[in-house]
Regions:
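Central helical "cap/lid" subdomain
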Residues: 50, 60, 153-204, 264-266
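Glycine-rich FAD pyrophosphate-binding loop
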Residues: 34-58
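N-terminal FAD cofactor-binding segment of flavoenzymes
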Residues: 55-96
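Short beta-strand to alpha-helix junction loop
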Residues: 69-75, 98, 104-126, 245-250
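Active-site substrate-recognition segment that forms the wall
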Residues: 192-244, 253, 257, 261-262
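N-terminal Rossmann-like FAD-binding beta1-loop-alpha1 element of flavoenzymes
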Residues: 15-42
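A conserved short coil-to-beta-strand element within the FAD-binding core of flavoproteins
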Residues: 135-147
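Flavin (FAD/FMN) cofactor-binding core of flavoprotein oxidoreductases
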Residues: 252, 259-295
């Protein structure tokens, strides 16, 4: 929906529920509200849907810049994933990664990791369906009386990292302000490295322990299923913290660290670095899957549990159901 049409709509009547953030938590929340017949509008400051399930095209192909994969153990989320799989949007990737550490390299088995041939963002886009998502809309303020940039709402959902939500909230909204202030987040950089050829041994993905630069490296060609000679590296929080002002300056160090780790003789043909100031929640306290207070402010995301795609989806889904029950 174009911004002008959105503005005409919300000035003609109350906006219903305004969801700020079109990542998987915000979209899952809005989906539940729409299903229950509750009027809902989604505002997203970026040009695309997806949030930290971010994919961007480099050299003609998508690469995942945020979440590296997702796992499934919730039956309801499994049903969503089954629909993605049936539509050709999601695929089982691997249940075995490797880990590099002081003792060398070893295989690590675990749950099945899922990937998306067209990028993880495509999954959020499918979930959004026909939801009224307005992109390129930067929300500036959420005030008492439930006013979003001066427009009344029946409830407001902030589906984003706590430090970003704090910038929008009027301090008079005390419960939500306290909730977002309690969140702690860690940064990361992701580097997309396109090499001349696949010179590395088969590893799919690698946890890197005790390294000054790297925390995870994924074979994006294997993950995507096209065999492209592309690696995506994720840095440690400590390394990222020193490069948040100029993330592109970290590109040589990230590339060299990957080449040293995997013994790659040739430099990358191209390299791109993306900054995540709030990459993942550092800690979670409590058992609640979302926040919803008497002021009508809801918070959702992977801060309400382990930092996983499934956590964010369930948080948004649960909040959407709670709001539908309150407003229905």
């Amino acid at each position: 929906m174009p911004p002008a049409a959105y503005d005409q709509l919300v000035t003609a009547e109350r906006a219903g529920v305004v969801v700020v953030g079109a990542g998987i938590a915000g979209v899952a929340c809005a989906t539940e509200l729409a299903r229950a017949g509750v009027p809902v509008r989604v505002r997203e400051r970026a040009r695309v849907t997806g949030g930290r399930m971010a994919s961007k095209r480099f050299d003609g192909r998508p690469a995942d810049l945020g979440a590296a994969y997702f796992t499934v153990d919730d039956p309801d989320f499994a049903a969503v994933v089954a629909r993605w799989q049936a539509a050709g949007l999601a695929r089982e990737w691997t249940d075995t990664l490797v880990a590099y550490g002081p003792g060398g390299r070893e295989q690590v088995s675990g749950p099945m990791r899922w990937a998306a041939p067209r990028g993880l963002r495509s999954l959020v886009e499918q979930l959004a369906g026909d939801l009224p998502v307005t992109h390129d809309r930067l929300v500036m303020s959420v005030e008492p009386g439930l006013r979003v940039d001066g427009t009344e709402a029946d409830a407001v959902v902030l589906a984003m990292p706590g430090p970003q939500a704090a910038l929008l909230l009027d301090p008079a909204l005390a419960e939500a302000t306290r909730a977002v202030a309690a969140q702690r987040w860690s940064p990361a950089l992701s580097g997309v490295l396109h090499f001349p050829a696949r010179r590395w041994t088969d590893f799919r993905g690698a946890f890197v322990n005790g390294h000054p630069v790297l925390s995870l490296v994924c074979d994006d060609g294997d993950r995507r299923g096209d065999g492209a000679p592309v690696l995506v590296a994720h840095t440690t929080a400590e390394f990222a913290a020193g490069h948040l002002l100029q993330p592109t300056a970290a590109r040589p160090a990230i590339e060299q660290a990957v080449r040293d780790l995997l013994g790659l003789p040739e430099p990358a043909v191209s390299a791109h670095v993306h900054r995540w100031t709030y990459a993942s929640p550092a800690a979670h306290a409590g058992s609640a899957t979302f926040h919803l207070d008497d002021d009508g402010i809801g918070l959702a995301g992977d801060a309400f549990g382990r930092p996983r795609v499934q956590t964010a989806w369930r948080s948004g889904r649960d909040l959407g159901r709670a709001l539908a029950a309150r407003l229905g």
